């Protein structure tokens, strides 16, 4: 068997394993990262495309596990954290970019990705800033690298600090960049954390549209942004479950399938972390991104533990 066939065979076997209940989110991510860093992913472009599609479908499926009332209440409870968090993250990110002398566009993209929704936010903001392809790529690679770290670190920190599932879910939803990493970290922590974290994260993601439009007006451009369709799908799924409670068992089965699809998604996400992606990041953007992420994570957790959040 030549090297190409061996890579394909290994990838296919591990992918199939991730579709079974025997593999959890953390194991799937580690297997994917190992493949990516060992240059053993035979289909990097297809992996990137299908991981995004599968993630969006999985998030919609998770909506069948929640009532619309739960979604609305969680969104209402976290909205001010989202508004304050986004504003402070953008301001601190701007300051850190100046401090570390990161390129203006790269710094802005990293800050925007950290504040709202990782790669989706970066992709939406890049045309507004007229960012070059290499600036966008560096910002995406930086956020992607930290997403992978968050999947492993957040559950460890949560258990170490003995956070309850509600606090961990809100913290993850507010402090982790991408939706995939939020659902991965929270699903490893518990069902309640997953439900809360996903809803809080999607509440943050809705802010892509108004923030991009505001930036476009400031820049004098015509770039528009729309709320991602999978967020509407998530709300629609929760509405269907609420309107048709007699099929609750079926909706629960759909939500269970969605959770297993998330395991497959995280394997694909990990497999996309190649050596080229790591090399592309560079020291200044990485230092800015890590500093911003640590500050946001720490301050968010402190805010959640203060008396007013009880």
Curated annotation (Swiss-Prot):
Subcellular location: Cell membrane
Record key words, sorted: Cell membrane, Membrane, Transmembrane, Transmembrane helix
Listed GO CC annotations: plasma membrane
Stated name of the protein: UPF0324 membrane protein GSU2818
Domain of life: Bacteria
Family: Belongs to the UPF0324 family.
Major localization listed first in the record, in broad terms: membrane
Pfam families: Cons_hypoth698
Membrane topology recorded in Swiss-Prot or TrEMBL: Multi-pass membrane protein
Transmembrane segments annotated in the record for this chain: 11-33, 53-72, 79-97, 107-129, 136-158, 193-215, 227-244, 254-273, 286-308
